[in-house]
């Protein structure tokens, strides 16, 4: 164990030392996560926003099914890898080195997509982009587990919401402006012979800068306990009992699965708009600006709402945003209302991401945190991989409106499950802690009375 545990013999003393280390290093760890998120997420948003990649694949192929295949392959890469990552990191005292490796490999794929656009063409370019999207997802899965685990180790739960709120605010300002600039000038002007490649190169530079600064700033604590290393087969067998013993987490997983199933529609928002008002770099940039601006405007509200009421509230409101914005998208055709619809979709995505990435930590013990997060992310990646492919088939046969209504139904089911069956885990934990404290108090009172009786008898 670390020096902070020297001479400490009881579990309570080690827990107090661990908490002390976290608060002592909170300022620099807060800054590290803030800068990493601001720069890193700014670059990743250029890749993950439902505009640039779908539009690029459509330009290269002219096919809705290929757009679906790209989204499917990216998510498919993250289906199994999170669980393997969790099994590797949950028994380690420190995971920063492996996190840096995973983060670097994830960023390399963005650079590869950029270089392929300059050096290749035709079918070879299309296949290469699809391949690197798969690798991007493959490393994205374990990277997400590792960095969320680091966040949980370094930042107290009472500060995570506002950290991510301010981080998303800053990153949203940069990303929104950058997306408009990239769409209008880099893609629209075909800078360096391929505006999309230039955009992805810019994303690589930003994300790499964030990762480098993060590694120089943060101080990772060693937890007072770590889970004993378990073979993968045995660890997988424990997943079902984990769900059975924690029904709140189980119902949350079902609700999250339905919410993610609604991603059948996500790659087709920009394609649908392009078919209605035409494709151009300015249209792509403007709607990406709307989607990402929602992070800027809403992130602080999401963060403080989560710190005050818990992350379940974010999830519920995000689903309402998604449902309303999808209905609006189908009903309007003017640029202003389309901008508002994409803003609503981005606001919902912002709230959902903040909730889904953090609420998982609150459902059980710290030692199982990595596996809960990995299981949750794996389920999300699986549905995200299947969803767009199914959406592509539906779009090609029944049209875009049918895809959008399927998404709305899935989101409505998730909303009902959250409202009826999933209790805010923070509230449940505080209630259990209060009951435990009351039981200890009653035990202490009983012991004191017994000692007094014994003294009287003597």
Language-model segment annotations:
Residues 140-155, 351-365:
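Intracellular juxtamembrane helix-capping segments at the cytosolic ends
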Residues 3, 8-27, 220-254, 433-458:
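Juxtamembrane intracellular "pre-TM" segments in multi-pass secondary transporters
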Residues 97-113, 204, 313-328, 405-408:
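Structural signature of the two symmetry-related core transmembrane helices
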Residues 211-228, 419-432:
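Helix-loop junctions on the cytosolic side of multi-pass membrane transporters
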Residues 30, 115-132, 330-342:
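Helix-loop junctions at membrane interfaces in 12-TM secondary transporters
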Residues 2-80, 85, 89, 96-106, ...:
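Helix-loop boundary and gating motifs at the non-cytosolic
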């Amino acid at each position: 164990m670390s020096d902070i545990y020297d001479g400490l013999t009881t579990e309570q003393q080690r827990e107090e030392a661990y908490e002390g280390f976290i608060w002592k290093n909170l300022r620099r760890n807060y800054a590290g996560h803030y800068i990493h998120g601001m720069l890193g997420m700014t670059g990743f948003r250029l890749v993950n926003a439902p505009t640039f990649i779908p539009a690029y694949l459509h330009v290269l192929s002219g096919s809705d099914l290929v757009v679906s295949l790209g989204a499917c392959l990216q998510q498919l890469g993250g289906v199994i890898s999170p669980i393997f990552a969790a099994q590797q990191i949950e028994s380690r005292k420190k995971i920063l080195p492996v996190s840096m490796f995973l983060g670097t490999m994830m960023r390399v794929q963005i650079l590869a997509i950029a270089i392929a656009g300059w050096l290749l063409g035709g079918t070879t370019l299309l296949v290469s982009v699809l391949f690197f999207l798969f690798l991007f997802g493959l490393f994205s899965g374990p990277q997400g587990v590792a960095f969320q685990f680091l966040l949980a180790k370094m930042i107290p739960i009472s500060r995570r919401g506002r950290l991510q709120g301010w981080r998303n605010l800053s990153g949203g300002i940069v990303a929104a402006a950058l997306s408009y600039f990239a769409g209008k000038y880099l893609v629209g002007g075909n800078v360096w012979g391929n505006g999309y490649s230039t955009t992805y190169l810019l994303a690589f530079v930003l994300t790499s800068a964030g990762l480098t600064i993060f590694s120089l700033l943060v101080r990772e604590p060693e937890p007072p306990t770590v889970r004993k290393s378990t073979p993968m087969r045995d660890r997988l067998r424990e997943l079902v009992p984990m769900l059975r013993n924690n029904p709140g987490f189980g119902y949350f997983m079902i609700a999250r699965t339905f919410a993610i199933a609604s991603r059948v529609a996500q790659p087709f928002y920009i394609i649908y708009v392009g078919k209605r008002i035409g494709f151009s770099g300015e249209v792509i940039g403007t709607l990406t600006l709307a989607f990402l601006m929602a992070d800027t405007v809403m992130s602080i509200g999401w963060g403080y709402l989560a710190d005050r009421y818990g992350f379940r509230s974010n999830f519920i409101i995000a689903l309402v945003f998604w449902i309303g914005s999808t209905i609006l998208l189908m009903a309007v055709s003017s640029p202003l209302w389309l901008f508002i619809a994409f803003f609503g979709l981005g606001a919902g995505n912002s709230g959902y991401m903040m909730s889904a990435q953090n609420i998982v930590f609150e459902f059980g013990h710290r030692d199982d945190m990595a596996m809960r997060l990995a299981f949750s992310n794996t389920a999300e990646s699986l549905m995200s991989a299947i969803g767009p492919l199914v959406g592509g088939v539906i779009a090609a046969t029944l049209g875009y409106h049918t895809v959008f209504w399927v998404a709305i139904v899935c989101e409505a089911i998730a909303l009902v499950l959250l409202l009826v069956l999933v209790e805010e885990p923070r509230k449940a934990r505080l209630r259990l802690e209060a009951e435990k404290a009351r039981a200890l108090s009653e035990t202490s009172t009983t012991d004191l009375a017994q000692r007094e009786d014994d003294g009287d008898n003597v």
